[in-house]
């Protein structure tokens, strides 16, 4: 049985970590490199960096950041946010990123998934899908959940897999930030429909929520931000409790 992965997510703006990070024991909680190293030490299995800045300098800033992080980190990390071309990905992977995450650009140009998986291998390609349950139908949204599309979550996920994605990062917009648990019914259906790993995102509030998403939601990995940043959950405690519950994790 493959071990379940715990993945902290860091939002990056102009090369700095944003969205409230409360790591008191760091000199500078805004420094993604320091945070990355701290999380790796605490037992994170992977990290995700989402770049939310929209500056012209972004590509250079991000490439430099990836290089700095890669030098400090011994666990895989994924970079996402505004990646829309083979060139973007080439730069990030050359600088040390293990995977890239694409979202809106995949919806606007689905062929990009094929191009990336053919050039770099599907293991590098994570497709992030944000969806909301509207009248019983899970609808894919873009631009951080602001713009609805006509796409059905499950149909789009199947297409993404067929086009060569290696993983899907599914965020439920209904659960994100609520701390009421993950969207386990939708996650379980994704896991049943697809053969590639599914990363659960949106809704983590306590350790039980992680246990539920691995058991009921059949997720392969769980991603969270604030519960880790604000030390509401320590990764070591989380993993110990998951193991006690019979869930296979890397300690």
Swiss-Prot record:
Pathway: Amino-acid biosynthesis; L-histidine biosynthesis; L-histidine from 5-phospho-alpha-D-ribose 1-diphosphate: step 5/9. One of its GO terms (cellular component) is cytoplasm. Belongs to the HisA/HisF family. HAMAP family: HisF. GO terms for molecular function: imidazoleglycerol-phosphate synthase activity; lyase activity. The active site is at 11, 130. SUPFAM superfamilies: Ribulose-phoshate binding barrel (SSF51366). This is Imidazole glycerol phosphate synthase subunit HisF. PANTHER family: IMIDAZOLE GLYCEROL PHOSPHATE SYNTHASE HISHF, IMIDAZOLE GLYCEROL PHOSPHATE SYNTHASE SUBUNIT HISF/H IGP SYNTHASE SUBUNIT HISF/H. Disulfide bonds: none annotated.
């Amino acid at each position: 049985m493959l071990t379940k992965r715990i993945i902290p997510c860091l939002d990056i703006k102009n090369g700095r970590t944003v969205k409230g990070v409360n790591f008191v024991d760091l000199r500078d909680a805004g420094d993604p490199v320091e945070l990355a190293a701290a999380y790796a030490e605490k037992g994170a299995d992977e990290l995700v960096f989402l770049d939310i800045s929209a500056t012209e300098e972004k590509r250079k800033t991000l490439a430099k950041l990836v290089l700095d992080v890669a030098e400090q980190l011994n666990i895989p990390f994924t970079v996402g946010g505004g990646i829309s071309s083979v060139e973007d990905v080439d730069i990030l992977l050359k600088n040390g990123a293990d995977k890239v995450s694409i979202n809106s650009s995949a919806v606007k140009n689905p062929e990009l998934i094929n191009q990336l998986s053919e050039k770099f291998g599907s293991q590098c390609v994570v497709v992030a899908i944000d969806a909301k349950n509207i009248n019983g139908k899970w609808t894919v949204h873009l631009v951080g959940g602001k713009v609805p599309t006509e796409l059905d979550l499950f149909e789009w996920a199947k297409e993404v897999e067929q086009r060569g994605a290696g993983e899907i990062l599914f965020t439920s917009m209904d659960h994100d930030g609520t701390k009421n648990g993950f969207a386990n019914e939708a996650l379980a259906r994704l896991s049943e429909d697809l053969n590639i790993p599914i990363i659960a995102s949106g809704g983590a509030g306590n350790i039980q929520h992680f246990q539920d998403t691995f058991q009921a939601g059949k997720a392969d990995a769980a991603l969270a931000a604030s519960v880790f940043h604000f030390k509401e959950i320590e990764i070591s405690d989380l993993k110990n409790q998951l193991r006690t519950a019979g869930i296979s994790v890397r300690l």
